Design a protein with these regions (language model features):
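Generic structural signal for beta-strand residues in well-ordered domains
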Residues: 11, 51, 71-73, 104, ...
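Metal-dependent catalytic neighborhoods of phosphoester/phosphodiester hydrolases
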Residues: 32, 61-76, 82, 87-106, ...
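A general structural motif
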Residues: 15, 55, 75-77, 120-121
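Metal-centered catalytic cores of metalloenzymes
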Residues: 187
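Short coil/turn linker and secondary-structure boundary residues
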Residues: 39, 82, 152-155
């Protein structure tokens, strides 16, 4: 159980772990242009299922490609945040929950398909960018999970939280209080 998740999302972790990956692009013809060593859908499923158990939740941050491969992922729950290549109605029979835009799932954690900038008070876990991306960009902390960037390997959300990846991300509440104190001093 990940207790820091907001209430609507806590059920994702009540019976297992939460794994996240993006930009699977199953059977998309342009994958080889993005990365010449793009692996097959079957190879991707094998990597995913090597980590994700039947009791876990799998979150895809968009750009699924051919949806029929999703049924081969052995997770208990499958969640999708739509990407720029995803048609809204195409995945309703393959995912348990589908979201259309960026999603704050905890105080300091934002899931999105495309990177979101200008939010130094949260960790943005996203995909979309098929090049390697530095952890900090434009003052914001990011984890890029485009499949080809992260070795087609999903991350375990609970594990990265325990490892302290968000420990150095300031709280928006703290930032608001600090700014108010600064304003008060200027008066």
């Amino acid at each position: 159980m990940i207790p820091t998740l907001y209430e609507p999302f806590r059920h994702w972790s009540e019976k297992g772990s939460v794994y996240i990956l993006s930009d699977l692009h199953f059977d998309d013809a342009d994958c080889k242009f993005m990365s010449p060593d793009w692996i097959t859908p079957q190879e991707q499923i094998s990597i995913i299922n090597g980590m994700v158990m039947k009791s876990d939740t799998f979150i895809c941050l968009g750009d699924v490609g051919s949806p029929e491969y999703i049924k081969d992922i052995k997770a208990r729950k499958k969640i999708l945040i739509l990407g720029n290549h995803d048609a809204k109605g195409a995945y309703k029979n393959y995912f348990d929950e589908i979201y259309t835009g960026p999603l704050f799932i905890a105080e300091k954690i934002l899931l999105s398909h495309e990177p979101v900038y200008g939010l130094p008070w949260c960790l943005n876990i996203h995909g979309h960018d098929h090049n390697h991306m530095e952890l900090y960009k434009e003052g914001c902390k990011h984890i890029n999970l485009a499949a080809n960037v992260c070795g087609y390997t999903p991350i375990n959300l609970g594990k990265i939280i325990k490892e302290g990846v968000i420990a150095d991300v300031p709280s928006i509440h703290r930032m608001t209080i600090d700014r108010q104190v600064e304003r008060g001093k200027k008066l």
